[in-house]
UniProtKB/Swiss-Prot annotation:
The active site is at D326, E422, R490, D510. The lineage of its organism: Archaea, environmental samples. Changing D326A: No cleavage of target ssDNA. No cleavage of supercoiled target dsDNA. Belongs to the CRISPR-associated endonuclease Cas12f family. Target ssDNA cleavage is inhibited by EDTA. Activity is maximal with 5-50 mM NaCl, is less efficient at higher NaCl concentrations. Residues 193-312 are annotated as: Wedge domain (WED). It comes from Uncultured archaeon. This is CRISPR-associated endodeoxyribonuclease Cas12f1. InterPro entries: Cas12f1-like_TNB (IPR010095). Optimum temperature for dsDNA cleavage is 46 degrees Celsius and occurs between 37-52 degrees Celsius, no cleavage at 55 degrees Celsius. Optimum temperature for ssDNA cleavage is 45-55 degrees Celsius. Zn(2+) 2 binds at C475, C478, C500, C503. Mg(2+) is required for dsDNA cleavage. Mg(2+) and Mn(2+) support ssDNA cleavage equally. GO terms for biological process: defense response to virus.
Amino acid sequence: MAKNTITKTLKLRIVRPYNSAEVEKIVADEKNNREKIALEKNKDKVKEACSKHLKVAAYCTTQVERNACLFCKARKLDDKFYQKLRGQFPDAVFWQEISEIFRQLQKQAAEIYNQSLIELYYEIFIKGKGIANASSVEHYLSDVCYTRAAELFKNAAIASGLRSKIKSNFRLKELKNMKSGLPTTKSDNFPIPLVKQKGGQYTGFEISNHNSDFIIKIPFGRWQVKKEIDKYRPWEKFDFEQVQKSPKPISLLLSTQRRKRNKGWSKDEGTEAEIKKVMNGDYQTSYIEVKRGSKIGEKSAWMLNLSIDVPKIDKGVDPSIIGGIDVGVKSPLVCAINNAFSRYSISDNDLFHFNKKMFARRRILLKKNRHKRAGHGAKNKLKPITILTEKSERFRKKLIERWACEIADFFIKNKVGTVQMENLESMKRKEDSYFNIRLRGFWPYAEMQNKIEFKLKQYGIEIRKVAPNNTSKTCSKCGHLNNYFNFEYRKKNKFPHFKCEKCNFKENADYNAALNISNPKLKSTKEEP
């Protein structure tokens, strides 16, 4: 039976810990007092430096704006104030402490994750000589991995999160066939996974809406701050010890101020509407991840990923109407419908040409900075490359999202309820094909297929993966196999139209392949878990 919901991930930035109402009132009053003092001292400079702040009537969101804004500078509280406040309220948690807690938990979670993966691989492929099944993996995860994490963290939510993370990343069939390696990770990039537990105290995620602010309470309860600071480590402002008895969970304030300024906040569909429904309790979350920011300027920030089940949007599609999507180089995406003349194609492969330019620019920067930017570490030397990579990733994601929306609109307009796509997993193993090498090098086809598949499933359209064998050589009219029409022939003749040797049927090569893919007689291939 098909599910009526689809799992979606919402990404929000953690602003700061949210304490009791009394502590929050003291902090807000102190910020307002300092803002008034700064306003009286700098009356002449306020209009020039804080014009945006005064127009928007809200506080700055980016770090550049905060550094240039006198209001934000004045509202920034120092360590002396927090030390004094910590003496009055010992249970209060502030940003420096919560950041250190996240860092310690992230490091220990990554260690358990890597250790469990290595031991699981050893038990199956070294000791067991490759003889294992899904039940034995589940037995190891329940008995060894979960027990080890629960003993270390004294937290069932993190232990269950690590177990599910290892289970999803440990692909037994791919490891047996040597299609992939062991998916170990670094502690800087590893998230802190938490799974909602049933029963008991402080086991779930309590989400509340206080003065239109998104507040989530999560069961982190096992760390507390030592009063004594180690004299041998004066650079560390806080030192932590692990306690056996879990105190109250930590409340976190999530960033929604920038989203509230957008027009989408007042709409009933979209990401902003889903965030509002989570805040109001309409959508429930059972899995979250705390992760360090990955973009430039967000390395010191912490992000929270919430997994929610969103109901599918009913567009009145017909499952008996079958469509097909062909992936190519000259035309990146071509859509066709079985026994129909409607078609849709994205003719200009902007992403392919953009990636080629990015690779060329990357080579120029590497050659240019070979003897420059030296003496300050690899991070400083490769900073231009990192900036270029992030720009290209943002462009790629936006372009793929636009293509996915256009394809979804085409199939919804034609009431298509089933879409067949090529299973391109075999392209990982074929190194002798020029087409495969070219496609993998400049075009993230897997990411594009996943995005299109997710977008179509949102509207209740079923996805079927079919084998890509001879879809470009077969005539969509008579079914004759034209062996001459291979990729070398198409490349030599500058990607000509397809012409059948038997019935002289002539059509665009990518559209002919899309028609073959939309054939309901093709056998579906199930992807390996």
